[in-house]
Amino acid sequence: MSLVPMVVETTNRGERAYDIYSRLLKERVVFLVGQVEEHMANLVVAQLLFLESENPEKDIHLYINSPGGSVTAGMAIYDTMQFIRPSVSTLCIGQAASMGAVLLAAGEAGKRLVLPNARVMIHQPLGGFSGQASDFEIHAREILRIRENLNQVLSHHTGKPLEQVQLDTERDNFLSATEAVEYGLVDKVISHRELPEAEAES
């Protein structure tokens, strides 16, 4: 079991200890780290909904470092990002591959960021099925439907023609930070946190 650092915050009410992720959640930062699967997706969705209830007008910052994973789990996060009222800014740290790349691109236009040494990878969904021969055709059709849906999502958020996205996701397609900007998956490569306007002007 991995160790989660704790931070201690001192207020006029005394000291209070938080795990690091809970403390960052107070700053409206949500981490999407590791394999995209049902449990992780439920936690991310719950955090997004909580932050919306806290302040529906203030941006949420989604930090992504993920190799991808379950399409259904990922689409639960995607749909929630589109559903809630706050804008969701996305930032790729490390990598955003497969479903992680879709979620990176799904951030608010103009607020999708990538660190300079991160990488992004897009491809078609992987299919694996074992069972009765009569069910293979059903699952093959479902994989094709999912693939078409994901390509439409990427086309919508990148501005690329659907036919181009279909071609570019035939095989694993790795992009550097700069290439991800050129493709339209993100809006900007950043190497330093930008200062708030008030500090920049002083």
UniProtKB/Swiss-Prot annotation:
Enzymatic reactions: Hydrolysis of proteins to small peptides in the presence of ATP and magnesium. alpha-casein is the usual test substrate. In the absence of ATP, only oligopeptides shorter than five residues are hydrolyzed (such as succinyl-Leu-Tyr-|-NHMec, and Leu-Tyr-Leu-|-Tyr-Trp, in which cleavage of the -Tyr-|-Leu- and -Tyr-|-Trp bonds also occurs)
EC assignment: 3.4.21.92
Protein's name according to its UniProt entry: ATP-dependent Clp protease proteolytic subunit
Keywords: Cytoplasm, Hydrolase, Protease, Serine protease
This protein's record includes keyword Protease: yes
GO CC terms, sorted: cytoplasm; endopeptidase Clp complex
A GO term for molecular function: ATP-dependent peptidase activity
GO BP terms in the entry: protein quality control for misfolded or incompletely synthesized proteins
Class of the enzyme per the UniProt entry, highest EC level: hydrolase
Job description of the protein: Cleaves peptides in various proteins in a process that requires ATP hydrolysis. Has a chymotrypsin-like activity. Plays a major role in the degradation of misfolded proteins.
Stated family: Belongs to the peptidase S14 family.
UniProt gene name: clpP
Subcellular location per the Swiss-Prot or TrEMBL entry: Cytoplasm
InterPro entries: ClpP, ClpP/crotonase-like_dom_sf, ClpP/TepA, ClpP_His_AS, ClpP_Ser_AS
Pfam families according to UniProt: CLP_protease (PF00574)
Subunit structure: Fourteen ClpP subunits assemble into 2 heptameric rings which stack back to back to give a disk-like structure with a central cavity, resembling the structure of eukaryotic proteasomes.
Active-site residue numbers: 98, 123
